[in-house]
Amino acid sequence: MIDSDGFRANVGIIICNRFGQVMWARRFGQHSWQFPQGGVDEGETPEEAMFRELYEEVGLRPEHVQILTSTRSWLRYRLPKRLIRQDSKPVCIGQKQKWFLLQLKSNESAIDLNACGHPEFDDWRWVSYWYPVRQVVSFKRDVYRKVMKEFAPTALPFQTREHHHSRRGRRR
C-alpha cells in the first residue's frame, strides 16, 4: 500500500535474545545487512503484516516470539533516487514503517531463512544492540537510530541508553 505522499506502508522487526543482542540478517546475494522488514498488504493490520513477514523472512511463528513493544508512530525514510522505480504507478519514494520489538522465546534453531522457498536473507547472526545503527545502509540509518533509541528502555532495561555514553573518557 502506497499512501498519497508516495510512502509504502511497511513493518520492521527487531528480534532480541535473552542477552540483549539483536538478530542481524544479510540480504540474499548481497553484502548489505538489515533487520527483517516487509510491506503491509491491503486490509492487513501492521501486527498481521509483522507476523506474516516474520514467517516469510526468518521462519518464526507467533508462538516462537513475544511482542515486547512497537513504535508509537510510523517512521519514514526516503529511497535514494537510483532505487525509485519511476515506471511504477503510484511511484514509491520511500517507506513508512511501524516497528516491532520481539523477544525470541524458542530455541534459535527455529529460525529458518528458507521457510518460504524464496529467501530474503542468506545469513544471520546475533549482534550487540547498537551495532545495526552504525552498519545499516545510510538511507535507513536515521530510522534505525530512532527505533533503537525508542526501544532501548525495553530491550536494555539495566544498561545505558546509548552505547557511546559509557565509552566516553573522563574530563580532566
Curated annotation (Swiss-Prot):
Enzyme Commission number, as recorded: 3.6.1.-
Protein's UniProt keywords contain DNA-binding: no
Domain Nudix hydrolase: 6-149
Segments carrying motif Nudix box: 38-59
Keyword check for Hydrolase: yes
Listed transmembrane segments: none
GO molecular function: mRNA 5'-diphosphatase activity
Gene Ontology CC annotations of this record: cytoplasm
Family as reported in the entry's similarity comment: Belongs to the Nudix hydrolase family. RppH subfamily.
Described purpose of this protein according to its UniProt entry: Accelerates the degradation of transcripts by removing pyrophosphate from the 5'-end of triphosphorylated RNA, leading to a more labile monophosphorylated state that can stimulate subsequent ribonuclease cleavage.
Name listed for the protein in its UniProt record: RNA pyrophosphohydrolase
